[in-house]
Amino acid sequence: MAIFRKRFDLKVSVYSRSSCLVALGLALPAVTSAVEFNAEFLNNEGGAPVELKYFENGNSVSPGTYSVDIHLNQIMIRREDVVFSADPDTGSVRPIIRMGLLKEIGVDIARLTRDKLIPANLENNTPLNVAELIPGASVEFDVNSLSLLVSIPQLYVQRHSRGYVDPSLWDDGVTALFSNYQANFTRNTNFGQNSDYRYLGLRNGFNLFGWRLRNDSSLSGGTGMRNKFSSNRTYVERDIRALKGTLSLGELYTSAQGDAFESVRMRGVQLQSDIGMLPDNEISYTPVVRGIAETNATVEVSQNGFVIYSTNVPPGAFEITDIYPSGSNGDLEIKIIEADGRQRSFKQSYSYLPVMTRKGNLRYGLAAGEYHNDGQPSVNLLQGSAVYGLSDRVTGFGGLLAAKKYNATNLGLGFNTPLGGLSADVTHSQSRTRRGGRNQGQSLRLLYSKTINATETSFTVVGYRYSTEGYRTLSQHIDDMSDESYLYGSSSSRQKSRIDLTVNQTLFRRSSLYLTAGETTYWNRPGSSRRVQFGFSSGIKRASYSLAVSRTQETGSFGRSDTQFTASVSIPLGGSARSSQVYANAVSSQHGDSSLNTGISGYLDEANAFNYSAQANYSKDGGNSGSVGLGWDTSKAKLSANYSQGRDNKQINLGASGSVVVHPGGVTFGQPVGETFGLVEVPEVGGVGLDGYSSVRTDGRGYAVLPYMQPYRYNWVNLDTNTLGSDTEISDSTQMAVPTRGAVVAKRFSAESGRRVQFVLSMESGGKIPFGAQAYDKEERVVGMVDNLSRLLVLWDANKDSSVQIKYHPYK
């Protein structure tokens, strides 16, 4: 079945119930220059004449409007309808490039005006001959991919960071009310006695004019329990584009930039930066590479042996600011390849910590409200924090926190050094207790990360914190103020020191070692908590296996320790991605506890909509047990059922999760949705699939919920054209969306359904319609092409009393 993406500006119209008028034009394949063809070669006896004037003029399309992919300097920018018109003198068909289109795709209009290449103050709809006005520019049309290829010298292109998305494309979505639900029912049978448990978790939302109202709540109950409804939190938020941030009001969790303070629950207002609005290379710390080129040179930047960036630079000093490293650590190798073939290389250290950001980048957070946690006193609080890139290698951060009888100040610096990424900060707190006492102290934190390329050793995070006895976090201060603490003393453990270490070592292909270790000590209790885990993982062909040992130790008055050994293996039973997997996992501890789990899991259909699992377990204390499970992913929900049985107990678990979306077009059921999601409409066409979501289909009214979209980034919504029936045609199977955070973005795809009807055409004079003539409807869309016997096959949703009128407009 053909999928059409063209819309033509011809004088045509269609009338249902009375008549249908179809205009016939001619559109023929492209040639690169004017050529004359002998039409007799294509004629057969009794067949229609062939009109080849478009071939002879070298055109690839006929005049009209086309939905095309617009590329600027080989980078896909957007999809848009572009008008193609014919020159009345030459007959050449060319795209009309508007002034507004050049602005939208990132051409530097101000510089073009300053260099007097275009007049000032042109209207957005003013057509421009780009190739003639801008030296070195060109506009080409690739009919095979329906792509408009615009080439502009880099001097006249606005410079944006990698991953930049024009904020004018941000879409707040449609007005929508939705609920994301998770329902579970569990029945346990122990020694013949049944007990049930029911749970319904809801994440509700309402979107209106860019505002997002959200509520998290749940309903639970069961045997011997009263049904209980609880609302965890309710809040409203919206983005503040000018500040590249989000404003939130209601029941919130504070967010301190640079992790200056702990996150606490409050009722109030919060304004904080949203890094999702930033380009990719501004989200995290990115290095700036500087050097000097002697000629027109190529600069390559490599990390861990892979080229991650390449660009051409003119002679002289250069500065590269849009590098996006492939990992958080690993020195960069910069190679300068001169025009005469000479090469020079040097290395630049790069280690990244989450607190670090690029030069000039500011992240901020402001919060004001009332501390709110069940069972604890409520106090007013005010908090502010910020992270700022001071230079290419130094980031500064800090914050202030004030509450009733409490205040804290944080200040720190992050460094990118040849020895690795390092940050240090100190927090000073002052608080008063309910008994009138005064606490004052400091907490020092050090973080370090480094990758040694020569040995492929990565110190992912090495952290150390030390707090003096008088230091308090806000939650510890609130605990000191509580009635229970006033009567019996504080029950919370106040941390004195903590050290954490994570090391990863690559050995060879698919094999690696890891080590994690840590120790924590406390002021108000003796002893310490220690934890160490060491592991090895590898694979043989498609099978994978791992070994690990873990030890925990609590020292002091109630000291205890335990060491566990684990081994696991997973083997696929086939070569495809949907092949079933056989797995086994064994665990043993120093106290004699041991268990063995073996099982199989996989899918039952090609679309991976039905999944299954079966498992057999052995436990030294619990004996033998087994379980089976089934899952079914539908367009409207995800369903699951599991049954397990042990020596003395049985359990049945049923689950369902999904979403209900109320929108201007009605009510649509879908799979569980994320923070930002989409709504796809193919009017009145059911069963249409979406690429990337094998189990999602449009319902009978043509709606489907697209479960996940990435905010502030290009999201391509693609219909699975293989799921369209032979009686359905769609003009464009791909659309682009850039949702704001929390938006419900609606995308409508124009589709036509009907029966295939064949017309045998002839002129009043008795002559045939030329072979290759195209037919257009009143929507200016291609509906068919005349064959060599003057027949036209179209998709037509006709009524009983409908008729069709056809006018032929030969190309001149």
Descriptions of predicted regions:
Residues 2-4, 10-16, 21-25, 32-283, ...:
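Post-signal-peptide, soluble extracytosolic/periplasmic N-terminal scaffold domains
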Residues 88-97, 323-329, 703-725, 729, ...:
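Short Pro-Gly-centered beta-turn/loop motif in secreted/extracellular proteins
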Residues 62-84, 684-693, 765-779:
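Short, ordered, surface-exposed loop/turn motifs in non-cytosolic proteins
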Residues 70, 289-291, 678-683, 755-764:
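A short, amphipathic beta-strand motif
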Residues 83, 694-703, 780-791:
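Short, acidic Ser/Thr/Gly-rich low-complexity loop/linker segments typical of extracellular
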Residues 168-172, 196-209, 229-242, 378-392, ...:
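Feature captures outer-membrane beta-barrel proteins of Gram-negative bacteria and organelles
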Residues 147-151, 354-357, 670, 732-754, ...:
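Extracellular beta-sheet/turn segments enriched in Thr/Pro/Gly and aliphatic residues
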Residues 156, 185-189, 210, 219-223, ...:
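Transmembrane beta-strands of outer-membrane beta-barrel pores
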